[in-house]
Structures are given as C-alpha cells and as structure tokens.
C-alpha cells in the first residue's frame, strides 16, 4: 500500500489556487504550440543568420506574404514540399521569389519550371533589365518550361543545353501552375515517361535531396487525387515515411482515397444539403491535417480579416455578375441551338472509329499493336470520338463562326477518307491504310484533353482488313448531316449574329457609363482562337469607328493590334493594355503614348498575368472547367488594383 493523502491534498490545493491570468495564458500557449518548440532544435525554421530579411525582395512583401515565406520554408524543411495555394491575385510569384532568395543564400541551386506563356514573369527577376525591381538581389535560378522535361536534345529558350543539363543538382524546384502536373504518372506507357514521371525521376529523385515548392491558386481541378499527385512530388512517390512524419492515422494514399469517396457522396446530396460545412463535417481529420501541414492557402477574406489593410490597400469590390443568354441569330426563323443539337446527336463520327469496322478475324492483330499508354486501340479511338463530339458542342456555344469552321474541317476529314476508300475500290490507291486513334489538327483542343494522348500514337489500319463498305456508308451519312448544318449556319453573318451584337452593346454601355472614372478597358476571354479571330475582326472595326477605341487580340497563335506602332507581341500588347501593372513606361518607354482599350484573348493569358488596370471582364464563352473561369477573373481581381470595383 502507498499513502497518497499528501498528493491528493496538493492536487486539490493546486486546483483551487488563484493563478495570475498571465500564467494561464502562457500555459495555454504552451499546450497549443509545444510541438513547434521541437522545430527550433531540428533546423527547420529559417536561418536568420543568412540575412534574407535584408534582401530587396523581402522588403517588397506585404506582411501576409512574409508570413507565407516563413511558413513555406518551415514546411519545405520539415516535409520536403509545400503547395502555395493563395487565391488568384495575391502575389504568389513574389512570395516564391523570397523563398528562392533564402535557398540561394544557402548555396542551393534553384530551378523554376513554368508554362511557356509565363516565362517573362520569371526571367525578369533573374535578369539585368530595367524593370527588375530586385536586381540587387542577384537571383541566379534557372528557368525551364514544363515541356522541356520531355526534350532530350537541343537547348532551352534560355540557352540551357538539355542534353548535358545536370538535372539532379537542384536543391529547390519551384513549379509554377503546378496543377498542370495533377494527372500524375498514370498515363505513361512502359517505354515512354510523361512529364510528371520525368520530373520525378530526372530532377527530384536524382542527385541531391530536392525540395519542391508548388504554386497554384487551383491545385484541385475536379478530384482530390489532383492534390495527391502534386504532393507526391514532395515525398518522391514513397508515401510511407511521409505519412509517419505527418503523424497520420492512415497512410496518405488512404487519406485521399477516403476524401474522394466522401466528396462523391457529398456531390450527390440534395442542393439544400450540399453545403461547404456539410462537406467539412464529412471529411476526416487526417485530410485537414495534411492540408494544414503542407499547404499555405489564404483567401482574400482571410487577408482582410487578419492583416492591416492600410498597408496593402483595399481590394476592388466585385459587382454582381451579369449573365447574358443571346439567341443564335437575330432572324426569327433561323436555326436554333436545339435544332443543331438534334442534328449533331445523329452523327456517328465513324471517320474516327475505323477499328470498329475491322473484320473479326483481324481484330486480334491490331489489339496487339494497342494504342500506347493505358489506352487500347479502341479506347484511343473512342476518346478521340468523344473529344470531337464535345468539341463540336463547345464550339457551337463559343461562336457560330468557330462552329462553322469546325464543321468545314470535319467535312474535309470525311471527304479525304471517302476519296481514300474510292481509290482503294478502283485500284488507284498509292497506299491502302488509314491512320487511326490520333487527335486531328486544327481543332483547338484543350491542353487537358491533349495530355491524355501525350504517350502512345496512331495506328495504321489496312483497308483490306476492314468492312470498308460499311465504313464508307456511315462516313457518307455523317458528311450529309455536316453539309446540311453548314448550309443552315452560313446565313448567320456578323450582322445577324445575336451574340456578337450583344458583346458590342456591352462594350458601348461600358464606355458610356464606366464603372470607374475614365476607365474604358474591357478584357474579353474565349476558349477558342477561331472565336478570338472572329471577334477581333468585327469588334475592332466597331470599337474604332463608333467609339474611338483601340483593340488587340492575344492567342496562342499570335497577336494583332489596331495600333500599328505597337509590335504584335504579347508583352507589348499587354503592357499597352495595362500600363500601370505592366510598368509600360519603364519596360517599353517607346510605347508610352500608346494605349489599348480592348483585348480579346484566349486562355493563353488566363494564368499569371497582371492586368488589373482593367475593371471589366467578359466571358464570351464558359469554359467547361470552372477552374479556368476563376483564373480568368484573377487577371483583373488582383492585389494592387486602383479600381474601386470590378465587373
């Protein structure tokens, strides 16, 4: 037996003892944050002795960005990776530059991987140019495109020899727009790696221990696995040790699998029950633990609530969106969307499905050839057919011009196939095979769709192995439908295009009643370059003649501008459109007297561009992926905007 009387008395006395509020406060702080005290002895906090707080980039950051830098460094040191997922327009590039400066101060080589269209966002800050506000920091990081990962010969646009580059020497890799790697390595074939796998094998796993900082305002596209694939770059595809370090009850693969299952159930709930709070209650604690420990994600509301806005300046107020639903044509008895859809629904698109017409005795021969990657020959064909069907509907929603051009290209593909079959029938063919399973050119497919066909390739099918008579019959039936549709939409010219006329009306109203004083700028987004060409041709003439406005077009195929003095280059055009945010007078003083009022663009500028001089954005078509819409809004809804409100 052991006498515990004294211990009990002491405990009761301590419970009833009067303690100073300060002591209670400190004890509470200790209980909440004690685990972080271990960090001090584990070398995962920023090393203040490096003097990174004296750098130019650090002193250009707002307080919320400085907090992000410190958190990112801690997460990189602790978990080897971090996703900076602040909302669009909150300055992720500058935050990342401060992290880069810290690691360069530690003599780490740094690689920045970015989309080609965003190269100027990065090469400005490591170059000796007049518009580099942090030139004194002498940043030395390398810049490569995402696509350079797949190249084995030649030099990068920045002059790096890709065949001799020491990929494994980088201590830090910064991936801008990391959601482009969200599909992971699942689509790779046995003999060819995709970009994700090349990044993992050549850069991250090889050589020195590499830390990975990922930047994306939209790391999740439509499934939680998108986030998991990006985080896998940080744990090198080996989740076991990472799960232990995060102190998860389940391994990280299970965490994301469960989260996706929960989300799927939540998405099927009635609308009144499908709330954010309901989803949060359904997800398990491990999922939130992962998010908390390896991501930094703040919204505009978070910044407004927890930081001094007098230093940052107010964000522009978002006016309620204005939806417009114009008809296809101003002519009352013209064809409508429903009638076109019924015609499209009758198409078999047999021209893209030749393997469906193989003789049964020949099917095994082509099954062995396969389609590459995880796609069989038939699966590849089915994918192309579905993409073409979707593409027709998306282009119809975009503009009657884009739809008509697509029909004409489709008809040409059908006519070419019919000629090939006829030559085979008459014995005039120089070759007797048709190409199967490849994406056709000239259809402006979304990059997400093209990525699915990144590996593998087309297969040649001999006509003698096919029931080419049935194939010819079905192609001919489709061609008849396409000809009918072309005839029906050809009457809808720009003077009868209700959607185009509605856009011109919006521009006129904006100019006559600006939402901010003297601001006449309008940014128009479309998913297709054909639509952008069509809009530029018609809107620029209207804007110039009737409103005295200058107009420009920016697509992946090139630029154009009504101001002949402005070079048809993206950066020059955007500098004249948004001269304050793009520092036009410093970057291009020869263009200081030229201003552009309207820019019509594809999604080639929906990421990473600072265009906040503009206060009015029009989605001429709605991209199927809502993430793209968020990115479009982020071009004008940004920190540092001088506009009181945006539309």
Task: Give the label of every model feature segment.
Residues 226-229, 610-621, 646:
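A short beta-strand element within the Helicase C-terminal
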Residues 95-98, 106-129, 219-226, 526-533:
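Conserved Walker A/P-loop ATP-binding site and its immediately adjacent core
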Residues 1-87, 94-106, 124, 168, ...:
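ATP-dependent helicase/translocase motor core
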Residues 635-647:
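Conserved segment of the helicase C-terminal RecA-like domain
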Residues 41-61, 313-331, 336, 345-595:
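Conserved Helicase C-terminal RecA-like lobe
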Residues 117-141, 234-238, 538-546:
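Conserved helix-turn-beta segment of the N-terminal RecA-like "Helicase ATP-binding" lobe
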Residues 143-173, 177-180, 185-210, 214-219, ...:
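Inter-lobe coupling linker of SF2 helicases/translocases
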Residues 139-156, 168-171, 576-607:
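Conserved two-lobed SF2 helicase motor
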């Amino acid at each position: 037996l052991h006498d515990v009387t004294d211990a009990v008395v002491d405990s009761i006395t301590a419970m009833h003892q009067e303690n100073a509020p300060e002591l209670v406060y400190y004890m509470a702080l200790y209980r909440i944050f004690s685990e972080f005290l271990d960090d001090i002895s584990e070398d995962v906090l920023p090393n203040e002795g490096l003097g990174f707080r004296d750098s130019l980039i650090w002193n250009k950051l707002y307080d919320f960005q400085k907090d992000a830098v410190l958190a990112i460094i801690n997460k990189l040191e602790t978990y080897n990776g971090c996703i900076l997922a602040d909302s669009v327009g909150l300055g992720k590039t500058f935050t990342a530059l401060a992290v880069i400066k810290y690691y360069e101060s530690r003599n780490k080589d740094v690689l920045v991987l970015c989309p080609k269209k965003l190269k100027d966002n990065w090469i400005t800050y490591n170059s000796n140019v007049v518009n580099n506000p942090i030139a004194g920091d002498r940043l030395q990081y390398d810049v490569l495109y995402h696509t350079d990962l797949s190249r084995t010969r030649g030099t990068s646009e920045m002059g790096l020899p890709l065949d001799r580059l020491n990929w494994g020497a980088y201590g830090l890799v910064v991936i801008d727009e990391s959601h482009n790697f969200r599909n992971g390595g699942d689509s790779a074939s046995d003999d060819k790696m995709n970009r994700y796998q090349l990044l993992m094998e050549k850069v991250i796993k090889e050589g020195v221990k590499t830390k990975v900082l990922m930047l994306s305002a939209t790391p999740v596209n439509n499934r939680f696995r998108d986030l998991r694939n990006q985080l896998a770059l940080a744990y090198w595809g080996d989740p076991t040790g990472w799960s232990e370090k995060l102190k998860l009850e389940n391994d990280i693969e299970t965490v994301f699998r469960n989260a996706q299952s929960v989300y799927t159930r939540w998405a099927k709930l009635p609308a009144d029950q499908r709330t954010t709070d309901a989803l949060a209650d359904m997800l398990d604690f491990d999922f939130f633990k992962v998010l908390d420990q390896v991501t930094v994600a703040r919204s505009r509301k978070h910044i407004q609530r927890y930081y001094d806005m007098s230093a940052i300046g107010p964000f522009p107020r978002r006016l309620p969106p204005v939806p417009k639903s114009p008809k296809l044509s101003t002519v009352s008895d013209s064809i409508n969307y429903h009638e076109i859809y019924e015609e499209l629904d009758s198409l078999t698109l047999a021209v893209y499905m030749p393997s469906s017409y193989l003789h049964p005795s020949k099917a095994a021969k082509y099954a062995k050839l396969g389609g590459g990657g995880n796609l069989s020959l038939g699966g590849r064909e089915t994918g192309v057919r579905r993409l073409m069907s979707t593409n027709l509907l998306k282009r119809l929603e975009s503009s009657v011009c884009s739809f008509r051009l697509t029909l004409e290209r489709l008809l040409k593909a059908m006519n070419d196939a019919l000629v090939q079959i006829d030559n085979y029938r008459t014995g005039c063919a120089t070759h007797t095979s048709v190409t199967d399973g490849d994406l056709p050119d000239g259809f402006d497919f979304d990059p997400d769709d093209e990525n699915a066909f990144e590996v593998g390739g087309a297969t040649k099918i001999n006509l003698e192995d096919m029931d080419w008579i049935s194939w010819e019959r079905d192609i001919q039936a489709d061609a008849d439908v396409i000809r009918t549709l072309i005839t029906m939409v050809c009457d809808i010219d720009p003077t009868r295009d209700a959607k185009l006329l509605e856009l011109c009306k919006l521009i006129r109203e904006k100019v006559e009643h600006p939402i901010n004083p003297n601001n006449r700028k309008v940014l128009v987004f479309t998913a297709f370059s054909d639509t952008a060409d069509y809009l530029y041709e018609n809107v620029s003439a209207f804007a110039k003649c009737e409103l005295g406005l200058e107009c420009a077009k920016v697509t992946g195929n090139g630029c154009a501008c009504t101001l002949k003095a402005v070079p048809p280059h993206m950066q020059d055009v955007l500098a004249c459109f948004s001269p304050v945010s793009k520092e036009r007078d410093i970057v291009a003083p020869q263009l200081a007297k030229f201003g552009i009022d309207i820019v019509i663009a594809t999604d080639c500028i929906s990421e990473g561009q600072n265009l906040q001089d503009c206060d009015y954005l029009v989605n001429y078509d709605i991209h199927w992926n809502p993430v793209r819409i968020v990115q479009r809004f982020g071009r004008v809804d940004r920190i540092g905007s001088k506009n009181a409100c945006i539309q």
